[in-house]
Regions:
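N-terminal helical cap/lid subdomain that shapes the substrate entry/recognition surface
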Residues: 5-15, 20-97, 118
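A short acidic, often aromatic-flanked loop/helix-cap motif at beta-alpha or helix-coil junctions
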Residues: 89, 99, 142-145
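Catalytic-core regions built around general acid/base machinery
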Residues: 97-106
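Short active-site oxyanion
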Residues: 107-111
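Conserved phosphate-coupling serine/threonine residues in phosphotransfer and NTP-handling enzymes
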Residues: 113-115
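Substrate-recognition "cap/lid" segment bordering the active-site pocket of phosphatases
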Residues: 117-145
Length: 145
């Protein structure tokens, strides 16, 4: 059976950011997860084990830890996002092959992420592919849901 996929049939491309445009084994999300636990620990005065349990509870109940923190604890979302995305991105290397592949795709390209706009910009710059995207749709543009 012949593959009928033709990239020229598409006008828009939407890319997820984290663990999609760079390898999961770069351990970026594990850093974010640890920062979420530390944030909860600091703000709620919990040890790390109980902070992680609270993170999981909020995630399961609200779909994101942030939504739970906003709802139950009135946490200001930008303070949370700035804290949890203050991470080391040095494991992400410039990806020239990805840049070329993105340039070859016809149509507008967008990033969609449940991370912050600033985090998305930082990752895209680290990868060397930011200029390929028309815009970034982040957790802020989605009203933190």
């Amino acid at each position: 059976m012949k593959n009928s996929f033709n990239q020229n049939n598409y006008s828009y491309w939407i890319f997820d950011l984290d663990n999609t445009l760079y390898p999961e084994d770069d351990n970026i999300f594990s850093q974010v997860k640890m920062k979420i636990i530390k944030f909860i620990s600091l703000k709620l005065r919990l040890d790390l084990k109980n902070a992680d349990l609270e993170r999981q509870r909020l995630y399961n109940l609200y779909g994101t830890s942030l939504r739970g923190l906003m709802t139950e604890y009135k946490i200001i979302p930008n303070k949370f996002l700035d804290y949890v995305h203050d991470i080391d991105l040095s494991a992400i290397i410039k990806n020239l092959d990805l840049n070329v592949a993105l340039q070859k795709l016809k149509g507008e390209k967008y990033i969609f992420t449940n991370g912050s706009f600033k985090h998305a910009e930082n990752v895209l710059n680290q990868l060397g592919i930011k200029d390929n995207f028309k815009s970034i749709h982040s957790i802020e543009t989605c009203n933190y849901i």
